[in-house]
Amino acid sequence: MACVVSWNCRSLRSKVCRIKDLIYEVHRVCIALQETYLKPADIAKLKRCSLVRKDNENESGRASGGVALLVSHDTPSSVITLHTNLQAVAVRVMFSNLVTVCTLYFPPSTSVDERDLNRLVDELPTPFIILGDFNGHSPLWGSKNTNLRGRQIEEFVNTHSLCLLNNGEDTYFHQRSRTFLNQVRFAPGIIWSLSFRSRVTPKWMSVI
């Protein structure tokens, strides 16, 4: 079965070898990356894949955050143009049906306007999957507690009748801080007709 991988890679360029391994593994149709740490002038190419990215720089001009989608050239796809200030990109990908895949990153220190989230959903053709690192805590996706960002995401999920695709496990353990980072993915209820399964690999990559 074709699958989608979501990974907070914390620098695309430093993880190129691992990303290439993912690309050449069987059935990796689409790879959603967060915290790519790329600047607009940075060149990033991978053979037999299209790369759709949104770079981000902090106030000092250093690469910070950023998202990207890698899609196999063997899979029909088209880029969705998003008009959002959020760190997000989206691609329409052919599985057994056409599905919009969106990757999204929320920096921990940045507030997220609910209106921006609502506008993002309005721009995504259905059915869609949103994958990302939202830096939010909630028992709904494996955290032991709930923070303000987590409650905001919970409300967002309820407002748009989205289905969480997490399996309830903690999704990323940060060795230095000894804390779990949160990879969350969700989709409208209609997506279940496509028979997606969700799991977390030992490498803390979310696989759908």
Question: How would you label these PLM feature ranges?
Answer:
Residues 1-208:
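A shared catalytic/ligand-binding motif for oxyanion handling
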